Design a protein with these regions (language model features):
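Alpha-helical scaffold segments that flank or form the walls of functional sites
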Residues: 60-61, 80-143, 165-176, 431-442
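Acidic, glycine-enriched loop/beta-strand segments at the rims
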Residues: 13-24, 37, 281-282, 348-389, ...
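C-terminal cap of metal-dependent C-N hydrolases
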Residues: 365-420, 427
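His/Asp/Glu-enriched, well-ordered alpha-helical/loop segment
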Residues: 240-247, 289-377
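Metal-coordinating catalytic core of metallo-dependent amide/deamination hydrolases
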Residues: 133-254, 259
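N-terminal metal-binding scaffold of metallo-dependent hydrolase/deaminase domains
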Residues: 1-48, 61-62
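Active-site gating loops and adjacent loop-to-helix segments of metal-dependent hydrolytic enzymes
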Residues: 77-107, 141-156, 220-247, 267-270, ...
């Protein structure tokens, strides 16, 4: 018999598109599925099994789990600071890729997924290497993961993944762990992949009905270089190569012109917005308001641990709003409800999971987060016409305020502690793996 959990008497923000609030409200889960959402009395009217778990959510916000639409697992946190993007890639990131082993890569994914889950993330799109280990990590931890191997085939990048290895992972992990673990096709960058790789990826995406993920237009240099090499701006070149479409998710998209925005909108291509990374690397502010106005699905991404430097999507929401405001010199943009939508339902739409996750609705999977509002920095909590919890979640709360996380109805975080795996063992192994990685990297650069 399926387990039953009632999250009762919280402040429920379902994020189903209507800005509804049930205050107080409840969420009833049966097995992996949401079976009731609403006011306390309405949900209480549902029959409850004698062995049902009842979680008292008084003074807690109850929201859908967060969707991280662009992540790189890694172990370079706190290194290569205060450097320009392409200098940083060549000096630190690419040498680390050369030194990477499957064992180190798996340790990095276990660290990233555990860190994200602890902070309320239920789904990640991870572009990484040796991703059989990432699949094991996601299955053990319980998080949803879209695995996107770094594919590169141009000269000088032979240490990345290939379309052949990506296809092998797609065939073995197309829909694994009861659908929680999926594989997409990953094209590292326009300057790392040949036109033939783009064409083959588009062909495979259609054949396997799967997604494509890549980076674009993170810096002005990329735009200028694309014009020099191809005579087209990056998104125009993507269109020319045939990869734009409803299956495609493009990270960053900072320096797009009006025509490129039109191309994304017309083709149904989605965007992963990474505000912390774009600020830290001084890449610039993406035109998120224009994207959304054009009907483009825009999700939030943390990017990697080295360019953020954490994987806290609660914090990412605050920076997404503040970056929008200061770049437009307009305090009315970056509305908390819009930002919450980007982190939940819009992120699920951008990654093809909106039928499954992203909002608290009957029939969807029970991906739920509770946030403890009994904090100095979250006081006062106001109700009715003065309701301020949406603003608190975006501007005041952080991942450390997350109390519990359910994925597919399984409670993976309880009282702020990850229960599905031994988080301390994962941290210890990641520390060892990082030391090994830097030793290997040093040996390679000294030869």
């Amino acid at each position: 018999m399926a387990s039953v959990t009632l999250i009762r008497n919280g402040i429920v923000l379902p994020m189903e598109g209507r800005r509804a609030v049930f205050d107080p409200g409840s969420v009833l889960m049966e097995g992996p599925t949401v079976v009731a959402v609403g006011e306390v009395d309405a949900v209480d009217a549902h029959p409850l099994a004698a062995d049902a778990e009842v979680v008292d959510a008084t003074d807690h916000a109850v929201i859908p789990g967060l969707h991280n639409t662009h992540l790189h697992s890694g172990l370079l946190r706190g290194t290569a600071e205060s450097m320009a993007l392409w200098e940083w890639l060549e000096a630190y990131v690419d040498p680390a890729h050369k030194a990477l082993t499957p064992e180190i890569a798996e340790a990095a994914s276990r660290l990233a997924y555990t860190e994200g889950l602890r902070a309320g993330t239920v789904s990640v799109v991870d572009m990484w290497r040796f991703m059989e280990g990432s699949a094991r990590a996601a299955e053990d931890i319980g998080i949803r993961a879209t695995l996107v191997p770094y594919v590169a085939d141009l000269p000088g990048y032979d240490y990345f993944e290939t379309l052949e290895s990506n296809l092998a992972l797609l065939q073995s992990h197309r829909e694994a762990a009861d659908g929680r673990v999926r594989t997409w096709l990953g094209l590292e960058h326009l300057f790392y992949c040949s036109p033939e790789a783009f064409a083959r990826a588009a062909e495979l995406a259609g054949e396997y009905d799967t997604g494509i993920h890549t980076h674009s237009s993170e810096t002005t240099w990329e735009v200028d270089e694309s014009l020099r090499r191809f005579g087209r701006r990056p998104i125009e070149e993507f269109f020319h190569r045939g990869i734009l479409g409803e299956r495609t998710l493009v990270a960053h998209c900072v320096w797009l012109d009006d025509h490129e925005i039109e191309l994304l909108a017309e083709t149904g291509t989605s965007v992963a917005h990474c505000p912390c990374s774009n600020m830290k690397l001084a890449s610039g502010p993406a035109r998120v308001g224009d994207f959304r106005a054009a009907g483009i699905h825009v999700g939030l991404g943390s990017d990697g641990e080295k360019e953020n430097n954490n994987l806290d999507l609660m914090e990412e929401m605050k920076f997404a709003s503040l970056l929008a405001k200061v770049s437009a010199l307009d305090p009315t943009v970056g509305d908390p409800w819009d930002i919450l939508e980007m982190a939940t339902l819009a992120g699920a739409r951008a990654t093809g999971l909106a039928d499954v996750s992203g909002s608290l609705e009957v029939g969807k999977r029970a991906d739920v987060v509770t946030v403890d509002l009994r904090r100095l920095h979250l006081t006062p909590v106001l109700h009715g016409p003065d309701f301020n919890v949406a603003a608190h979640l975006v501007f005041s709360a952080g991942g450390a305020d997350v109390d519990s996380v359910w994925v597919d109805g399984r409670r993976l975080v309880v009282g702020g502690e990850v229960r599905s795996v031994d988080a301390e063992a994962i941290r210890t192994r990641a520390q060892e793996a990082a030391e090994e990685l830097f030793d290997r990297r040093r040996a390679l650069t000294e030869t």
